[in-house]
Amino acid sequence: MAFFGEEAEQNVKKAIELKYSLIPYIYTYAREAHDAGLPIMRPMFLEYPYDVETFDTDAQFMFGKELLIAPVVKKNAKTKNLYLPEGNWLNYNDKRTLYSGEQWLTVDAPLSCIPMFVKQGSIIPTMPVMNYIGEHPEYPVIFEVFPAVEGQSASFLLYEDEGTDLGYLKDEFLKTPINVKTTLKGLKLLFPHVRVVTISYHLSGI
């Protein structure tokens, strides 16, 4: 990678670390793909079939239900024109900047940053970055919570199995629900105490 220079090396490293941190999210949707045939990478109109604007979004996609990815596909481009469907969306890279949905917008897109957005009212399971999968078998799951507006809930059903054998074919797996409801008094967490986890709240927009 040094052949391409230090900047390219750092950008690739950052992208790989992002992938590793999202493994619990990716693995959950990989199981859904196995069970239901739904792809992890989804055209926008698959999640938003009644929004005609999504029919023209051929350079962005949903990654599961919660994340919207808009990769730069034009040489030397420094910005990205993209469409956000209904709802509110946070810039997943800074976890702070909030955008209203049902609009086209242009965002900065340096080589070091893939434009990514998470829908308000989502929960993203993540894990610490490792050198390889299985380096730390007893890793903590970190739930990133992007709370819904008052009166609504954010939820996720995390899927886990050993990942090293076919035990899942014999129902040797765990599905763990997490729900965070936004109330007038604050956030109410519903989570079964089946393992130690970390909850990280991102409160922009509520």
What are the functions of these language-model segments?
Residues 1-198, 202-203:
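Catalytic core of carbohydrate-active enzymes
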